[in-house]
Amino acid sequence: MAELHIPLDIKSLEILSQHINSKGEIILTVQSKKTETPCHKCGKPATSRYGYGPELTIRHLPILDTPVYLVIKPVRYKCSDCDDLITTSESYDWLKRGAHVTNGLSDYLMRQLIHSTIEDVSIKERIGYKQLENTVNKAIDIQVNWQNYTSLSLLGIDEIALKKGHKDYVTVISTKPEKAAQVTVIAVLPGRLKKDVAAFLKTIPENLRKTIQSVCTDMYDGFVFAVTEVLGDAVLIVDRYHVAKLYRQPLDKLRVREMKRLKSTLSEEEYAQLEGVMWTLRKKHECLSDAEKETLVLLYHYSPKLKEAHSHALRLTQILNTHCSKKSGLAKINRWIKRVKKSDSTCFNGFLITLEKYKTYVGNYFKNRSNSGFVEGLNNLIKVAKRRCYGIFKTETLFQRLYLDLQGFEIYA
């Protein structure tokens, strides 16, 4: 049988012997080249050997798709600086204390887990489910490490249901650095109560809290009041896309009512000319084809109510698309509100009440035009992760999964 000689990739170890066991696994008996270890009580170097601890069997990176195990007896050292003869087992730079896989194998497994599941990787890498789960828990924290951040210029807050139809919500708080395209999750909180969100925001270190310029969220009061209580009114932005959703809903309901009326009053030939008006009303006017513009003119002729309401919606969209200061933007919104109130359109009455309530926070959008588009993209990733893992019901597990999927390649590649 041909032999292959390759060096062990851990310089602090010396191979004493090697063999292949009955399962076809490669067993390497090794010993450490270290001559001291930090005392677990005082932290000073302990250099006096005092026997050995129990033998450890640690799994290492595979060779030619064959599992490799390192067998080592950890040396115990006696600390000369401690009066009560404290002994400490040697610690290793290639192994986390209490772990059963080397750091190298741990990093490899984390790469395999990106956009995958523990069950899948457990089968592919022939490693126990519980052992892999413990490896994840040792490699990835269940909460944010603030030392990894120097700035939190833009935050996004949104909720997502872990169990559809059960109102089992979690709050996901994410950040998007100015010069980085990658979104990172800084918290997954159980529920969506104001007190829980506010409590987390208060845990943000003061030096990072000062760097927060914008916090994008929807109009849910639990998020709005939590942000304003801890960070103030100036940073909160009620996202423009949630605003757009609210004023397009009444327009859509009016369209349904008007189309139902027109179906009963127009002939089949005339009504057929209005086919596809739902998408015509939702498109930007500059994106309409000539045929769609003709359909829109015809719809306006048959339904003056829809024409007026559609013009109001287009005008508000135009205001939100305008690059201007907060003062100028709010002035435009106030004029729009007055114009709608004076008109015959009543479909926006409910939206106007909501807009008046959150107008200041909508106006903050004009400062630097931040929005929570990155949050909506993150929501899609979370939905995929939930389906891939057949449900994730613990906030700690969801945080770890998102950490791997979002930052795994950057950290472990």
Residue spans of the language-model regions?
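Short, conserved DNA-binding cores of transcription-related domains
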Residues: M1-D84, T88-Y92
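Short, conserved catalytic/metal-binding motifs centered on acidic residues
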Residues: L28, C39, C79, V121, ...
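Short, positively charged, Gly/Tyr-enriched micro-motifs
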Residues: G43, T57-L155, E159-H166, K210-I212, ...
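Acidic, glycine-enriched active-site microenvironments
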Residues: R97-D107, A187-G191, K341-S343, N349
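RNase H-like nuclease fold core
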Residues: E133-S214, D221-A226, D233
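Conserved beta-strand -> loop -> alpha-helix junction used to position metal-binding or nucleic-acid-contacting
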Residues: D218-D221, V227-E268, E376
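Helix-loop elements that line ligand-binding/catalytic pockets
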Residues: E270-D344
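Basic, amphipathic alpha-helical segments enriched in Lys/Arg and hydrophobic/aromatic residues
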Residues: I337-A413
